[in-house]
Structure formats: C-alpha cells, structure tokens
C-alpha cells in the first residue's frame, strides 16, 4: 500500500514514495515550518543524492518539480521527474548535459517567488563532488542558513553498496573544516550526523513499543515504534570530549531539537513518541562550551574494495564490546523495580518506579509463560502491575534504558515464596538499598553478593549495595530455595556527568 490510510495524508509505512507517480505526502514538513517562522534553511546535495532527500516525496515540493519540468508529454518518460532528470545527466554527452542543466535553470527562473524559494532551498542539486565546496562557499560568504541539511551522494554516504567509512569521513572532515575556519561560526553551530538504518543484524536491545491504544503507531497488528538502534554523532562546542548520551532518541528527536531551538511546532509528532524520545538537549553541555579541536587532515580516500560477507557462527556467542568506559551525560531517568509474590492468589505484583524528570520506557518479558507477549510501560512516577501465574514457577525479566535490568524468578510454593525483596535508590550516596522481609514461618539464609544473613521468620534485613560511578550490580539468592533469584543491574543518576557502563 502506498500509505496508511491511502492518500497524501496517510502515513509513510512503505517505500511507495520512491515511485515517481506517487502523489506525495501532504503533511507540512519541518523546513516549511522553519520558513513560516522566518528561519533560514537549505538542503545541500549533488546530482546524485542517493534518493535520500525526503522533501522530494512531499506534495508541496512535487508540485514545484512538476512546474520545472513542464507537461510530462513534452519530455521523454525517464525525464519526467527530477530524479529521472538527474539520473540521466551523467550519461549525456557534455554539450547535451550542459544544455539540459541550462534549460532547468531557465525553467527555475520562471517559477513564482514562493516556488523559487522552495526550489533553491530543497530541490537544487550541484554538480558531482561539489557538496562540501558549495557548503564552504556559503560559509565564506556569510550565507550559511540557520538550518542546513546535507544529503551526500552514494559514494559519500557510507552505504555499503557504493561507499566506505573513509569516503564519508572525508566529506564530514571537509564540512567541519569549513565550519572551524570561522571561529564565530564554530561557537554557535552543532552538526548532527544521522544514519537511516542499522547493519541488518540482530540488535540485543529491543526498542520501545507503543501501546495498542496509540493508533497512529500501529499498522494492522504491527507496531511502528522506534526500530533498531542506529548511531548518531553530535559535533559542537558543547559536545567535545567523546561523551555518550544514553537517553532514548529517535529521528523525531532532531525535529524536537529544532522545536526547542527555534520555537516551531511539528504537530505530526504524536504524543507517545514525544513521551519516549528526548529532544537531544541532554547530549549537550551548554554551560561549558569547548574550543574546537585540531584534527589531522584525512588521507586520500582509497578505492572501494569488494565487501566481505560475514558468516554467522554455528553457535551463538557474545559479541565483543569496546573495553573501558566513556564519559557519559546525566540522564533524566531514575528507574527501579521489585516484586511482591502473593502465594494465596497465585499472582505476582511488579512495583515500577521512575523518580526521574522524564518518562522512561520499560519492557517486561515472560520466560515461564506468564503472559502471551511482552508488557511495555511508559513510566514517570510509580505504577503496580499484577501478573496472574498459571504455574507455580515464574521467570520475568524487566529491561530499560542505559543497561537497566531486573530478573525475578522463583516459585509460589517454594521455601522463599514469602520472602519479599524490595529496593529503593539513594541518589545522594549512589547506593541501591535492598530490604528483604521474611513473612514466612521458617528462617531463611539470604545472600546478597556474598553478604549472607540469616533471617528468622518475621524478620527483616537491609543491605546497601554500593555503586561504582553510579553503576551497581547485585544478585540475591536464598540457600534454602534454589529456585529463588533476583538480579539487579542499573545506574544511579545524580544530575552530574558519569561514565558509560563498564565492560
């Protein structure tokens, strides 16, 4: 289907807009919002933009392109769209190529002032290999807009079909070198580098899933959600130092950042996505800008080599992770969770807490058939969720951002069925305070990471699990009950810079 529901107001749920005869999407784009607010903007692209200028797939810009090309019957079939026009240009003899470009420029001169602005800012493409030069030219002339979109060609895109990391790094260096050539410009500029897809392999961190009540985030029985993780790099005076920011973001976060900076509102972002995804400001330290670092000029880009195809191992094994830690930004989350087992009713209550300033997304996974599909929570404050247990055994895992993890396993009729282990977070001392309450009729030996204590019937024990740079990890077991286990992993925020999770 081209969209859902059909028509220009439908959602983009497929790649149908790549079809040149697609009507285009009718909602207002972010650049149009910027323009209405008097914010200057421009798209930098070459003849080959690899189909990645999404503005070309919206009705307002399709109309401008149609006005440029005239009536379709007057042009060869393959030149009836701007994409087709630029795709055909490289194979034309030089004189024919120059004449075609001149004809397009003359057609642009006939556009209305409003359409000409849209053409110049969104649809104009410079000759191959000139994107960085065009960008530098605007920097040097003082014409760089407040918001710039850079759409690289295939050879500079880092896409494995025709590019390489070396090629994209060279383009990025040239762009940053242009910005850094003007100290005043560097002092007020942020460069956000996005990737539009992952490597195609399994991502061990599941993305937030929207609740079924948010109709805008579902297509049939399939949630849109945030998809697999992709890298994003922010280069600016306020992000120097290799900091990691583990707040949840998605591609609308860039738009939310523009909203925060320029006071626009993109009404097409639904409330659930705003709840889950931040506006990128937590990745910046605006109070302490840094001077621009000096970087070595990259070597010439080597020729593209044939790509290797990785062979999946016959047996699953943990992938290697970079050793050590990175400096990390403070996060607006403070999640915690614990359970209470109710043997009489055959149920278990999960107590969920987030004492942070922003909503966090948690996902509860059943590993003993407790329910049919994972349960998802968008949490700010506290909530309890009761799980009916159809079997005596339970095994639940709760996952959240920045390595947050809880594992709850045991049985409703075992020796430790009446042992409740609750937790609270002491942000001041950055400790996880654990309380074990033995409401049963027999004594239990409770072990918290080697600190074993005998709790008589009706007794209560308290442990303070220390953290390192805010990171804690604890395992709770009971000698008399091999089925009982609690695993507690996470990071305690205190509003200050920390480090990434140690490997």
What is the predicted role of each segment?
Residues 1-503:
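N-terminal pro-sequences and low-complexity stem/linker regions of secreted or lumenal proteins
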């Amino acid at each position: 289907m081209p969209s859902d529901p059909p028509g220009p107001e439908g959602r983009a749920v497929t790649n149908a807009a790549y079809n040149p005869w697609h009507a285009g999407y009718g909602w207002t784009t972010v650049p149009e919002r910027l323009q209405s607010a008097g914010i200057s903007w421009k798209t930098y692209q070459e003849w080959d933009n690899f189909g990645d200028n999404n503005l070309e797939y919206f009705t307002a810009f399709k109309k401008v392109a149609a006005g440029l090309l005239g009536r379709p019957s007057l042009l060869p079939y393959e030149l009836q769209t701007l994409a087709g026009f630029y795709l055909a240009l490289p194979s034309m003899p030089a004189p024919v190529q120059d004449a075609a470009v001149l004809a397009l420029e003359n057609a642009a001169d006939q556009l209305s002032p409003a359409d000409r602005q849209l053409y110049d800012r969104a649809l104009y493409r410079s000759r191959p290999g000139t994107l960085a030069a065009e960008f530098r030219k605007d920097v040097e002339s003082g014409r760089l807009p407040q918001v710039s979109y850079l759409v690289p060609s295939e050879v500079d895109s880092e896409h494995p079909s025709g590019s390489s990391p070396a090629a994209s790094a060279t383009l990025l260096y040239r762009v940053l070198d242009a910005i850094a050539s003007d100290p005043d410009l560097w002092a007020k500029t942020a460069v956000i580098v996005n990737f539009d897809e992952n490597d195609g392999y399994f991502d061990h961190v599941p993305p937030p899933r929207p609740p079924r009540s948010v109709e805008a985030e579902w297509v049939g029985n399939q949630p849109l959600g945030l998809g697999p993780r992709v890298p994003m790099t922010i280069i600016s005076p306020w992000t120097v130092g290799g900091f990691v920011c583990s707040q949840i973001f998605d591609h609308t976060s860039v738009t939310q950042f523009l909203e925060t900076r320029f006071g626009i509102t993109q009404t097409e972002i639904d409330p659930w996505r705003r709840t889950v995804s931040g506006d990128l400001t937590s990745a910046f330290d605006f109070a302490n800008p840094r001077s621009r670092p000096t970087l070595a000029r990259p070597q010439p880009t080597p020729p593209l080599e044939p790509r290797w195809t990785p062979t999946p191992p016959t047996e699953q094994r943990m992938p290697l992770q970079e050793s050590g830690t990175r400096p990390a930004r403070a996060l607006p989350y403070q999640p915690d969770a614990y359970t209470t087992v109710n043997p009489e009713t055959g149920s278990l209550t999960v107590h969920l807490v987030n004492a942070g300033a922003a909503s966090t997304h948690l996902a509860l996974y059943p590993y003993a058939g407790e329910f049919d599909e994972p349960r998802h929570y968008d949490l700010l404050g506290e909530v309890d969720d009761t799980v009916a247990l159809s079997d005596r055994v339970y095994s639940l895992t709760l996952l959240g951002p920045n390595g947050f993890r809880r594992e709850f396993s045991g049985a409703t009729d075992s020796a430790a069925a009446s042992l409740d282990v609750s937790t609270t977070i002491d942000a001041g001392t950055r400790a996880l305070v654990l309380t074990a309450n033995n409401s049963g009729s027999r004594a239990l030996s409770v072990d918290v990471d080697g600190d074993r204590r005998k709790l008589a019937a009706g007794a209560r024990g308290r442990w303070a699990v220390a953290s390192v740079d805010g990171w804690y990890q604890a395992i709770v077991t009971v000698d008399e009950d091999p089925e009982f286990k609690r695993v507690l992993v996470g990071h305690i925020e205190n509003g200050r810079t920390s480090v990434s999770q140690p490997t």
